[in-house]
């Protein structure tokens, strides 16, 4: 199994690939930018839960492409820090969106963030293709390993 650091670096790389494809599609395609913004927002939301500081976040914020580049870099640093100081089997206690007290392992939270991002990256690729633009060549894990981008850091 890939290390948590490798998974986090992959998530950053894949999200960055999607954002680059959106930017290359001329005017940035607001619906595709909104999906990247949603990925960022939900990732921030889960990071805040791990940190014990969760509050109300807008799940669909509006960002520009340069703002998203900055947000993605900050998320990479934040999740790398969390993975270094949080055991994979640590309990993350939080209040869910339905107001219920919940608890999940840090490893489960990380998997949620990764799978959520993958889901929306698929939607981004579809939006790009439907609008006549090229999606990223790949945002899959194995091709990412071949680039070495997630091995040595980005």
Language-model regions, residue ranges each:
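Short, contiguous alpha-helical
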Residues: 5-61, 98-154
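Helix-adjacent hinge/juxtasegments
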Residues: 54-96
